């Protein structure tokens, strides 16, 4: 083996020493033919000693070991590359086959549909924004009008103050007239003591009141007094709206306000509640101890409901607020004095959150009402196919005591209320000259058409309720809280 290595070592210098290479052939001592190949060293002038040859052989062995280690390292790297390639192939198989053109087309179609939906939502948002801008413009005009009225009132107040000051600086004319001087028919004036210089300052306030609040027109066209309005009867007349309060912000565009027709301590027949219902988390209930506080906008208390309510169908009855829970068919009884939930009950099968609303929308699927006989709920179901369903509710546990199904389509009317067990509907929420157009008598189960004029003064009535204690309709018309006097025929 060393001789072979020496031969291999000598091969690279073949070109250098090719001119001095010799090949000899001769017989050895035993007569066998031997070939001898000789090459001259290119560097060494004489042959090295045996120890030097062993050093060369050792170096060659070391180089061979190094090459062997390099070969092993190369094999290890190749093995690592094979493992990585196998792992990648395994991942590719787990990921499944590559997308086909059909799959890419389906994905493209899905993206296009999503784009169309986003464009539709964008248009809806732009429309809603335009409506808000229009409402803002209307509110700004109303604000200007109210500011002008406020300035006029301030001028009138200043003028009145100056007049009062002028009168106080003056003196009443002295007179010594007695009862003998008083003309016949005016004897009661003689009780005044006019002999002194003292005088009384009388203050008066002029309030504009529609004539319909004093006199009412009968079906025959004659005006009648309010005598005889007590007790039950059939609705025959609705008066002009009287505005008591205007909401301060756009959150009051829709809402509900009410007084308790059966007040319990500590509340009175003057206690008023108000809820602005624009928003997704409506929980605030404003309470006013006096009507004057309500009209001035100074609540005495604000209730925070434990659960948000839905739309404008709430009522107050016997010290409790009854309302529909948001996005549900559940009716809740909330005791106002203790601020606790006393009962809650689902209305079986009732549509909610836009299934069967009134024509103006607003998630008015479930509408609570109060009349002389107690608590009611107005709604519809899939079984009734959108027709109005009436149920009498137990005010304590909210159980349904009796139910009637009418032939009046709920989405074809703007609102409804109940008087003396009869359901009445209003034809339009936005027409200035609407009508009370249908009546359904729960006593007979008979419905009929009506044409009783009903004024939407502000052209967006979102709530109409009857108060049996005051014999009035309460309504919320486009930010404004109004009342209507009514006339019932005698039973």
From Swiss-Prot:
Looking up InterPro entries in the UniProt record yields:
Olfac-like_dom, Olfactomedin-like_domain
* Residues that bind Ca(2+): 367, 415-416, 464-465
Signal peptide region: 1-18
Q: Which residues, by range, are in coiled-coil regions?
A: 98-171
Any GO BP annotation: osteoblast differentiation
* SS bond partners: 232-420
**GO MF annotation: an example:** metal ion binding
Record keywords? Calcium, Cell projection, Cilium, Coiled coil, Cytoplasmic vesicle, Disulfide bond, Endoplasmic reticulum, Extracellular matrix, Glycoprotein, Golgi apparatus, Lipoprotein, Membrane, Metal-binding, Mitochondrion, Mitochondrion inner membrane, Mitochondrion outer membrane, Palmitate, Secreted, Signal
Olfactomedin-like domain mapped to chain residues: 231-490
Q: Which domain of life is it from?
A: Eukaryota
The site annotation (Cleavage) covers 213-214
Region feature (Disordered): 151-189
According to the UniProt record, one GO cellular component term is:
cilium
Glycosylated residues?
43
Entry PTM: Palmitoylated.
The entry's localization annotation reads: Secreted; Golgi apparatus; Cytoplasmic vesicle; Secreted, Extracellular space
Listed under subunit, the entry gives: Homodimer (via N-terminus). Can also form higher oligomers. Interacts with OLFM3, FN1, NRCAM, GLDN and NFASC. Interacts (via N-terminus) with MYL2. Interacts with SFRP1, FRZB, FZD7, FZD10, FZD1 and WIF1; regulates Wnt signaling. Interacts with SNTA1; regulates muscle hypertrophy. Interacts with ERBB2 and ERBB3; activates ERBB2-ERBB3 signaling pathway. Interacts with SNCG; affects its secretion and its aggregation.
Function, in words: Secreted glycoprotein regulating the activation of different signaling pathways in adjacent cells to control different processes including cell adhesion, cell-matrix adhesion, cytoskeleton organization and cell migration. Promotes substrate adhesion, spreading and formation of focal contacts. Negatively regulates cell-matrix adhesion and stress fiber assembly through Rho protein signal transduction. Modulates the organization of actin cytoskeleton by stimulating the formation of stress fibers through interactions with components of Wnt signaling pathways.
Name by which UniProt lists this protein: Myocilin
Q: Which organism is it from?
A: Macaca fascicularis (Crab-eating macaque)
Q: Supply the gene name.
A: MYOC
């Amino acid at each position: 083996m060393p001789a072979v290595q020496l031969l291999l070592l000598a091969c690279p210098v073949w070109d250098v020493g090719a001119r001095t290479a010799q090949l000899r052939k001769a017989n050895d001592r035993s007569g066998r033919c031997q070939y001898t190949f000789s090459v001259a060293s290119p560097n060494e002038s004489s042959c090295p000693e045996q120890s030097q040859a062993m050093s060369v052989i050792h170096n060659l062995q070391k180089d061979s070991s190094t090459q062997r280690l390099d070969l092993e390292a190369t094999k290890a790297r190749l093995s690592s590359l094979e493992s990585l390639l196998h792992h990648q192939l395994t991942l590719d198989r787990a990921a499944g086959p590559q997308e086909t053109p059909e799959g890419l087309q389906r994905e493209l179609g899905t993206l296009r549909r999503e784009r169309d939906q986003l464009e539709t939502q964008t248009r809806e948002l732009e429309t809603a924004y335009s409506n808000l801008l229009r409402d803002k413009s209307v509110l700004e005009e109303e604000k200007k009008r109210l500011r002008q009225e406020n300035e006029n009132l301030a001028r009138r107040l200043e003028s009145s103050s100056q007049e009062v000051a002028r009168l106080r600086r003056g003196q009443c004319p002295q007179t010594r007239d007695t009862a003998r001087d008083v003309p016949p028919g005016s004897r009661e004036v003689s009780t005044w003591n006019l002999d002194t210089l003292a005088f009384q300052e009388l203050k008066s306030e002029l309030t504009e009141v529609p004539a319909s609040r004093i006199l009412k027109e009968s079906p025959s066209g004659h005006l009648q007094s309010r005598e005889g309005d007590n007790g039950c009867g059939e609705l025959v007349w609705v008066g002009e709206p009287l505005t008591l309060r205007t909401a301060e912000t756009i959150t009051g565009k829709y809402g509900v306000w009410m007084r308790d027709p059966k007040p319990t301590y500590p509340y009175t027949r003057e206690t008023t509640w108000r809820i602005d219902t624009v928003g997704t988390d409506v929980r605030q209930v404003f309470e006013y101890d006096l009507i004057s506080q309500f009209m001035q906008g100074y609540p005495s208390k604000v209730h925070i409901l434990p659960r948000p309510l839905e739309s404008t169908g709430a009522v107050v009855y016997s010290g409790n607020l009854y309302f529909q829970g948001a996005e549900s068919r559940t009716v809740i009884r909330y005791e106002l004095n203790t601020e606790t939930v006393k009962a809650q009950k689902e209305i079986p099968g009732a549509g909610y959150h836009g299934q069967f609303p009134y024509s103006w929308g607003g998630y008015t699927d479930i509408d609570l009402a109060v009349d002389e006989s107690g608590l009611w709920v107005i709604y519809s179901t899939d079984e009734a196919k959108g027709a109005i369903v009436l149920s009498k509710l137990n005010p304590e546990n909210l159980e349904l005591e009796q139910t009637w199904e009418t032939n009046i389509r709920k989405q074809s009317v703007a609102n409804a209320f109940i008087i003396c067990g009869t359901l009445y509907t209003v034809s339009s929420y936005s027409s200035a000259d609407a009508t009370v157009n249908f009546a359904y008598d729960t006593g007979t189960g008979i419905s009929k058409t009506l044409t009783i004029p009903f004024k939407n003064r502000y052209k967006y009535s979102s709530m109409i309720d009857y108060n049996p204690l005051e014999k009035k309709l309460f309504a919320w018309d486009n930010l404004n809280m109004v009342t209507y006097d009514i006339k019932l025929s005698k039973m």
